[in-house]
Structures are given as C-alpha cells and as structure tokens.
Amino acid sequence: MIFAVIDTNVLVSARITKNSSSATVKVLDNMFNGIIIPIFNDEIIAEYTDVLHRPKFRMRDEDINLIINYIKKYGIHSDRIPFDGNMPDEKDRPFYEVSLSVEDSFLVTGNLKHFPVTPKVVTPSQII
C-alpha cells in the first residue's frame, strides 16, 4: 500500500482526460483498487468538492460523490503538521501539511512547482 495525499489537479485530470491510460487515471484506479490509500482532512475534502463541481469540468454529481465518499470511507483522515517554510502557492499548504502527518507518505500532484522540492512530492507518473 502507498499512502498519499492526492492533489485536486490529479483528480480533475483523471476525470476529464480522454486518455484512459494516463498516469492520473492510473492513480485514481490504484486508489479504487486499494493500492493507494488517500490521506485527507476536512479542508482537502472541501476543496475537492468545490473544484470538482465547477461547471467547466462538466463532472456528474454521481462521479464526484463516488470519489469523495470513497476517500472519506477508505482513506485516512489526518491533521495537518505545521510547515514553517515558504509555499509557492499558499492554497496548497493544507495538502503538503497533511502529507507530513503520515510517515512514508507522498503528495501526488501535477504541479510540482507549487510545493517544496522533496522526495515526498511526486507526479502521478512517479507514483505508479
């Protein structure tokens, strides 16, 4: 099992891509197959809910609810561990700080530049 915080952009990409063999789709498949165990907190769930419901992504409520309910049921709810360093994008701080709460976990993102450079922060291709 791989424990990981999944950045919102990975979920969005997995759902809107037409490439069923893309790395983001594989991350989501691995999550649903119990290979990747998602780590989350209430802020992360709130962002997932907000972003996935944006009209521009044209996602069905059933698909959004399936993803969010799965994460809440089978994932690990965790608190943030404060990180005093600078973040290129402060809106991403909760994702990074939650990833710090579980030893040997990862943060999977398509936006490496938004996070500190560390082996903990990986792309979808790197985690699959």
Features from the language model and the residues they span:
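Short, active-site-adjacent cap segments at secondary-structure transitions
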Residues: L11-V12, A46, H114-P116
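Residues that scaffold the ATP/ADP-binding catalytic core of kinase and kinase-like folds
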Residues: S13-R15, V51, T118
